[in-house]
């Protein structure tokens, strides 16, 4: 919803807002912010708030400006009612007022506009898993999960229930639209699902979701971890991304796989044909690759309606448009880059008329099906060699993202205790 400056001033006064967070994500999807006082809002809207971007946005070694996207106004509900805190997601500009080319949120918006010009409407949603761990007397995290519950368990086996409920209520109060939540397969493992919305809103929701989960978990005496594979013998935590693409108000994925349209087949083919190339962005940690192939986590580049382990799954339900779910990503990804990659890959498939091979029910064990990269090191190489990746993200972002990932790989190889290295980095 668009808010004029007058609307914002009235909202701030009526809700006793005393603090405004100007929020953005760094290159790797980590939430960053500068807080301003309400009296500075006019300057933020008209001139922008300057900040030193060195070290935060890897491709930038300069001062930049933050300007609020006023449509993203949201109250942070865990702060007191008196002296409330709100946040905006921000647009990034150079000091001369020109758009900053490394603004990944803007880049996703431009991809959305490109789809719209071609006659397509797109919505995206997420299902994101996380673990809750106990904390010690000092409030520091332990590696002890908060319960021994399993899939869809209820209390008393599910000791996450109250925390999960508070997270959902906070998300709803912020306007982030969670739909369902449950206990997952692992001890202390949870999942919260979001309603589909436009890709930019979905990425904003995912970016802020992690902050909300960690904040509410801490208030309940737990530590929330999005580490992709914290336990060797338990399910990992992934980020499943739903895409619903329409043309002429009809889903290109039909209402069942039997009426999957040629455009829908080409869109899926586009993603499958490029998935290896953008895995560095969707799975940017050493630990991400330990999750692949364990239980329901995909390891091969296949698609299906019926089985639960493909990379891309067709989703059909009564009264709903057909959609697809991309299943390999994890919460450490930058959602703006990852969502842009998925949309761009799918549209490239349509533009090139790419054919979708028939392996609807192929299992992960089928050696004839290509695999996802086996390591972050392999993913880096594939991204650097990819013409698709270079045409989708700015060269400076690719260079610095790859360099940072390579530093991570080098540090891992030098680590005396690889497991301790991963926990220190990703837990």
Segments and roles (model prediction):
Residues 1-181, 202, 222, 337, ...:
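ATP/Mg2+-dependent ligation/transfer catalytic cores
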Residues 26, 93-99, 156, 196-202, ...:
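A generic structural motif
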Residues 27-32, 97, 132, 187, ...:
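Flexible loop/turn segments at secondary-structure boundaries
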Residues 88-94, 190-196, 243:
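Short, hydrophobic beta-strand segments
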Residues 124-134, 143, 174-194, 224-242, ...:
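Core alpha/beta catalytic barrel or barrel-like domain that forms the active/cofactor pocket
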Residues 144-154, 187-202, 231-236, 248-253:
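Active-site-proximal beta-alpha loop/turn segments in soluble metabolic enzymes
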Residues 155, 159-163, 180-186, 198-209, ...:
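Short, contiguous, pocket-lining structural segments
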Residues 208, 215-216, 222-223, 246-298, ...:
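Catalytic-core signal marking the mid-to-C-terminal active-site face
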């Amino acid at each position: 919803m668009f808010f004029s400056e007058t609307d914002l001033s009235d909202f701030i006064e009526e809700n006793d807002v005393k603090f405004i967070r100007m929020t953005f994500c760094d290159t790797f999807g980590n939430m960053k912010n500068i807080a301003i006082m309400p009296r500075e809002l006019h300057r933020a809207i008209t001139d922008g708030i300057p900040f030193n971007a060195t070290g935060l946005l890897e491709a930038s070694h300069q001062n930049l400006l933050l300007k609020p996207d006023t449509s993203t106004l949201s109250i942070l509900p865990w702060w007191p009612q008196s002296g409330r805190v709100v946040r905006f997601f921000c647009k990034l500009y150079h000091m001369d007022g020109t758009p900053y080319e490394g603004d990944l949120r803007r880049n996703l918006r431009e991809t959305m506009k490109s789809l719209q010009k071609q006659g397509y409407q797109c919505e995206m949603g997420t299902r994101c898993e996380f673990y809750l761990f106990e904390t010690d007397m000092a409030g520091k995290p332990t590696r002890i999960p908060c319960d021994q519950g399993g899939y869809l368990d209820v209390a008393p086996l599910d000791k996450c229930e109250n925390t999960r409920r508070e997270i959902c209520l906070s998300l709803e109060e912020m306007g982030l639209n969670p739909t369902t939540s449950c206990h997952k397969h692992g001890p202390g493992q949870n999942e919260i699902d979001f309603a589909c919305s436009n890709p930019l809103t979905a990425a904003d929701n995912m970016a802020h979701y992690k902050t909300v989960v960690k904040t509410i978990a801490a208030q309940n005496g737990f530590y929330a971890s999005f580490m992709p594979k914290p336990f060797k013998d338990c399910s990992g935590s992934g980020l499943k991304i739903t895409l619903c693409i329409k043309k002429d108000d009809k889903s290109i994925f039909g209402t069942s796989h039997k009426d999957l349209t040629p455009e829908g087949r080409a869109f899926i083919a586009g993603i499958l044909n490029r998935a290896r190339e953008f895995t560095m962005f969707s799975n940017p940690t050493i630990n991400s690759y330990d999750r692949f192939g364990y239980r329901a986590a995909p390891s091969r580049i296949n698609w299906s309606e019926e089985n639960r382990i493909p990379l891309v799954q067709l989703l059909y339900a009564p009264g709903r448009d057909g959609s697809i779910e991309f299943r390999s990503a994890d919460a450490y990804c930058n959602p703006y880059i990852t969502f842009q990659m998925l949309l761009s890959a799918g549209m490239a498939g349509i533009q090139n008329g790419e054919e979708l091979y028939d392996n609807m029910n192929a299992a992960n064990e089928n050696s004839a099906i290509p695999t996802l990269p086996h390591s972050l090191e392999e993913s880096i190489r594939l991204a650097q060699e990819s013409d698709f990746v270079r045409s989708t993200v700015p060269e400076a972002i690719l260079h610095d993202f790859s360099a940072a990932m390579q530093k991570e790989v080098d540090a891992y190889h030098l680590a005396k205790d690889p497991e301790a290295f991963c926990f220190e980095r990703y837990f």
